[in-house]
Amino acid sequence: MGRSLKKGPFIADSLLRKVEKQNAADDKSVIKTWSRASTILPMMIGHTIAVHNGRTHVPVFVTEQMVGHKLGEFAPTRTFKGHIKDKKGGR
């Protein structure tokens, strides 16, 4: 179930201010954020946003297909190293 249309999409105020400031200055430097729950808006297209994954900031280049998704979807928090192979002999 999605968010109510009456409320509009969630985006952190600090992130919104940084994106608007860069759009006004026509600057495309990396924006660092911890807000994984923020929705990607059309004004963010072309920006590189470094999203925190719990350990480091993962750079995410925003494209047109990402609009409407959350920033956290593009910065995985878990690393899967594969299942352990069974030993040959067994019991």
Curated annotation (Swiss-Prot):
Q: Which HAMAP family match?
A: Ribosomal_uS19
- InterPro entries named in the record: Ribosomal_uS19 (IPR002222), Ribosomal_uS19_bac-type (IPR005732), Ribosomal_uS19_CS (IPR020934), Ribosomal_uS19_SF (IPR023575)
**GO biological-process terms attached to the record:** ribosomal small subunit assembly; translation
Q: Which Pfam families match?
A: Ribosomal_S19 (PF00203)
Any one cellular-component term (Gene Ontology): cytoplasm
What protein am I looking at? Small ribosomal subunit protein uS19
Q: Which organism is it from?
A: Synechococcus sp. (strain CC9311)
The family line of this record is: Belongs to the universal ribosomal protein uS19 family.
